[in-house]
Amino acid sequence: MIFLMQRKTSLLASIITLLLLFSFAAFAAAPPPALQEPGERTAKIDLLLGNAMSRGLIAGGVVLVGNRKGVLFERAYGRSSAEPNAPPTEIDTIFDIASLTKVIATAPAILKLAEERKLSLVDPVVRWFPEFAGKGKNDLLVLNLLTHTSGLDDFPFASADPLHSAVEGAAGQTLKGEIGSRFKYADINFILLGEMVRRVTGMGLDQYVAASFFTPLGMKDTAFNPGRDKALRFSATISSDKTTLLGLVQDPEARQLGGVAGHAGVFSTARDLARFCCMFLNEGEFEGRRILSGRAVRQMTAPYFSRGGQVIRGLGWDISSPFSSPKGNGFSEVSFGHTGYSGSSIWLDPSADIFVVLLTARLDYKNTKDFSQLRSDLSTLSAELFSPVTEKSKLAHNDGPNR
């Protein structure tokens, strides 16, 4: 009898231990179950997305709200593409996240290489691109590419050798203003940064960010050129010639570059992006593992460029600019984020401990005003419903570049 009781006690202890271990590891397998609030709280978000679908802005999408501990709310809406018979959007639908590539792949890669002292944020670009030598751009720094203050502008690439065309075209073009004096959002800045990662490491950007970020974070559905084995989960996009694209990057320059580019090309899910956002709100740590240094996170999210308060940029991240619609009216001055042309956006507020992810199957690319309003309204609602902090705070401390 005593032996049986000891065995039962031991078994019970083992079960309790396993349950505790499972509870701590739950986010490793997937974010914790979202707190699906009843009544008016979620009804407001449902109504907002329902209106966007009824007005033809989007076919459907996924909304996810979280904090540094995990997911607070997640919900899928509508269809996964414009096709009338398209499958419904699911929480794990995989979206082309377009320019979010800049902040979840390219900029973190540059900061990680800087903290490893493999490059410096104040390196002249010519150090890594000898093609720029003698072209009047000796003062152009890596920092200028990250903040879109290089003076470079976008241009079409030759189809025969698009990467060579991109680098040579950037090196030879006349700058739009003095270096560092003007904010001009241009994809070419991040195309160069993506190629810089390859030249510094000897690895493709896709390989480097998978090894450094996506795999350690457990972002299993995040990649450039996602595998066809996940084709049934893709949200389709529409190319400029009205072709439906499934698992192929929508951005034409990224397609020319083989689907791997510093400005666009990553595909992801809302839950994978939640992992990345949690890491950033925890100053570079995720589930006890260091992904980026706290200093690198603070550097990326500090204000590096300001034009009379009208444009404030971090390193890759947007803080306050004409592109800041996802900031809404409830996020603080230290919040930051980015948008993607395909209908994606993320916005994070460390002072209020909240982030918002919006991934959509966008239909109307011309109605930018209403789409910006959708992003803004979602963040305003999310802050109102889920954030315990409402007061605004001062701009973050600028740690300065790694040298």
PLM features: residue spans?
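Short, gly/Ser/Thr-rich active-site loops of penicillin-recognizing serine hydrolases
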Residues: N282, A296, T301, G309, ...
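Short, surface-exposed loop or secondary-structure junction motifs
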Residues: Y77, S81, K135-S335
